[in-house]
Every structure is written in C-alpha cells, then in structure tokens.
Amino acid sequence: MARQFALADVIGERDWSVDLGAGAVTFGDDLRFPVQLLGSESHGDNTWLWAWANEASNLPPALLHLCAWMRDYGRNAGVGELTDRTFPLTRADGHRLALLASGLTGRPYYRGPYAGGALFFHLEGVPPTALPPERALTVISQTISAFPFDHRTGVTAFFEQQGWPFSGGVAHHPGGATINVAFDDQGRISQLNGSLPPRG
C-alpha cells in the first residue's frame, strides 16, 4: 500500500494511456514508464483473467514476464489463484493480486479502468518516494482493514521497507517522528498511534 500512495503522489490526476507495442504507459504529457501486464477484471461476468492466459488479445510476450513469473511462483507455493487462468472476483480481485505481486517485486501497480473492466499492470522505473510519516498510520490502518495477513510480520516488513528502525513496538523515522504499535495475544494490532516532531 505504501508504494501505491507514493505512486499516486507521482502521477496525480493525470490521464493514462497504454501502448502495448511500446510496452509503456503514459500519464498526461510528461510521465512514461515501462510496464509488465498482470491481468484484467471483467465487470460483465465478474471474473479475473491472467494476462498470460489472455490468448485472444495476442499480447506481446515481452510484457508477460511478470505474470508468468507469478504463475511459476504459484505452482511452487501451491497458490491456485496464481495458476488458474481465470476465476470469480469473489475469490480474489485485481487489487489483491496486484498487491501480492507488488509485495514480491517491490514495484507499484496501476488499475486502468476501461468500458466493461479494468487492466492491471506493474510499472517499472518509478522514482522512489519516501512515505511522509503522517501517511504511515493511514497506510497501516487501511491495509489491515482491507486484507487478512499477519499484522506483526506485515508491520515489521513495512517499517523495514520504509527504512524506519522498529523495535519494542516503536518505529523511529529519521526526521524524529515515532509510531507506536501494540499487538494482542493473537498478533493483531491492538493499538496504533504516533507523534510528529514540532515544526520549526
């Protein structure tokens, strides 16, 4: 989720356009990034279709490396949602699958809506943007509300990815902000708060 917030800060409200031949997405008139396709949602029958399984669209093989890697990862890990060609969105939707891929690759994703569905793809070469301390609480809160996962492991990984030292339930931002996290006996977040240093 942190990568998604950072991406949103970069692209703002710009329109998007994908050039499959060039393997790139354009945002507005000034931003262009290489892409790797993940798959698409159909709003007609509420299903997900992996890009590697979308033979009818004759997608360029060079844009399918990531989704093919995800399929192989799913085979090794025994995750059917990564190996089945298509399935209902009630089983797993595009956001969940794209976030999983983002966690494995460290790249942000984009959901490109179109008439009847949406295309999901990863972006390469997006400049890294540090998440402001005041946004960290929002990211953690929204993530634990939207997705089932081990809170302790997820929070620890989040602070590590952001470069915040985290020990004893306290994360320290280099700029002086702190976030306090407490967990219950089942490893779920029971308390979450933070403080910002006074602005000079």
Each predicted region: which residue ranges?
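N-terminal leader/presequence regions that precede the main folded/catalytic core
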Residues: 1-72
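Short, solvent-exposed secondary-structure boundary motifs
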Residues: 2-10, 91-103, 152-163, 170-173
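Short, ordered beta-strand-loop transition motifs
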Residues: 16-22, 113-115, 166-169, 184-185
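Short non-domain terminal segments
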Residues: 25, 118-119, 181
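Glycine-centered tight beta-turn/hairpin loop motif at sheet-sheet or coil-to-beta transitions
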Residues: 30, 116, 174-178
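Surface-exposed beta-loop interaction hotspot
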Residues: 55-149
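Alpha-helical oligomerization segments
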Residues: 132-200
